[in-house]
Amino acid sequence: MKTLLLTLVVVTIVCLDLGYTMTCCNQQSSQPKTTKTCAESSCYKKTWRDHRGTITERGCGCPSVKPGIQLECCKTNECNN
């Protein structure tokens, strides 16, 4: 009976994917710090300049960017602040 219960617990954990999640900053430019819990294993910070000045975008994952956009990807909680 104990073996069956242990097996059910392990199967539940594997099926629900109760693994590690990241906490990434997601505020834009100079806005107050906000965070988001992400399923991805990394966070990013994109920076570029336009007529408004320097723009910063933060979020989950590590996206592809166009030339002229600086991208920093990292793998620890809130590392993209």
Swiss-Prot record:
Q: Tell me which positions the record assigns to the signal sequence.
A: 1-21
Primary location class? secreted
Q: Can you tell me which family this protein belongs to?
A: Belongs to the three-finger toxin family. Short-chain subfamily. Type I alpha-neurotoxin sub-subfamily.
Subcellular localization: Secreted
Give the matching SUPFAM superfamilies: Snake toxin-like
* Cellular-component GO terms for this entry: extracellular region
**Pfam families with a match to the protein in the record:** Toxin_cobra-type
Provide the free-text tissue specificity comment from this protein's UniProt record. Answer: Expressed by the venom gland.
Record-annotated disulphide pairs = 24-43, 38-60, 62-73, 74-79
Name of this protein:
Short neurotoxin 1
Query: Which organism's genome codes for this protein?
Result: Hoplocephalus stephensii
Which keywords does the record carry?
Answer: Acetylcholine receptor inhibiting toxin, Disulfide bond, Ion channel impairing toxin, Neurotoxin, Postsynaptic neurotoxin, Secreted, Signal, Toxin
Q: What does this protein do?
A: Binds to muscle nicotinic acetylcholine receptor (nAChR) and inhibit acetylcholine from binding to the receptor, thereby impairing neuromuscular transmission.
Name the Gene Ontology molecular function terms of this record: acetylcholine receptor inhibitor activity; ion channel regulator activity; toxin activity
